[in-house]
Amino acid sequence: MKTTPGLRIFKPIIPHTPKPDSRIYVEDAWTMLKPAIRAIFLDEPQDFACSGLFNAVNKSWCEKSSGEALYKLILEECEIYISAAIQSLESQCDTDPSLFLSLLEKCWLDFRRKLQFLCSIAGGEGQTVGPHSVWDLGSELSPKHLFSAQKVRDKLLSIILQLIRDQRSFMSVDMTQLKNTTRPVMSVHMTQLNNLRGLFYGQSLYKSPFFKKPFIDCAVEFYSAEAMQFKEQSDIPLYLKRVEYVA
C-alpha cells in the first residue's frame, strides 16, 4: 500500500520591526503644530498643510503617553496667547461698562473661534486625553487668567454686582437677557454676560471662585441697608411684621 507523504507547512519568517518611539510622533506633530498655533492666534497667513498636520497629530493621539505629551504642549502654547489677550484688557478697565463688556466678549469669542479652528485641523475637538479634550482648553485657560488678572476680574465683578443691586432696587433691569437676548439694558448688553458664561468654567456664576464671597457680601450689605431704611420709615409694629414676613 502506498502512503501519501505528510503535508509540510512552511511558516514565513517575518522580520521583527521595532515599534517607533512615541516621542517621535510627538516631535513630528509639534514641529508642524506649533507654527500653526502661532499663525491661528496671531491672525497670520496660514501656509501650513492641513492634511499633513492632521495626520501627524493623529498619530500622537493613538497612544496615551504621546497624546498626553502633545496635549501639554498645546496647553502651554495656547496659554501664552489667551494670557496676553486678557492682560491687554487691563488698560480698558476705566472705560464704560458696556464698552468693557464688549471688549471682554470679543476676546472670549475670538479665542473660542480660534480654538475651534485649531481642533478642526488637529483632530482634537472630540479627542480626549484622560478626562480632558483639546476643547477643554478654553474652559481651563480662560477662567485661570481671568481670575489672575485682578483689574479685569474686579471690573467684571463690579459690573455684575451693580446689575444685581439695580434689580433688587426694582430698577428696570431685565435679567432674562442673560438667556440669549440682545437688547441693551441700562447701557449694558446683558447678552454679553450670557456669552461670557463660558469664562466661569461651566460653573454657576454664583458659585465661581472669584464671585461667591463678593456676591454674599453684596447681599448682606443690600439687605442690611434695606432693613435700616424700612426701620427708620416705619413704626415698630409694621417693622416687626416686616421682619416676620422676611424671615
Curated annotation (Swiss-Prot):
The organism's place on the tree of life at top rank: Eukaryota
GO biological process terms on file: ubiquitin-dependent protein catabolic process
One Pfam entry name: Cullin
GO terms of molecular function: ubiquitin protein ligase binding
Family indicated by similarity: Belongs to the cullin family.
Protein name per Swiss-Prot or TrEMBL: Putative cullin-like protein 4
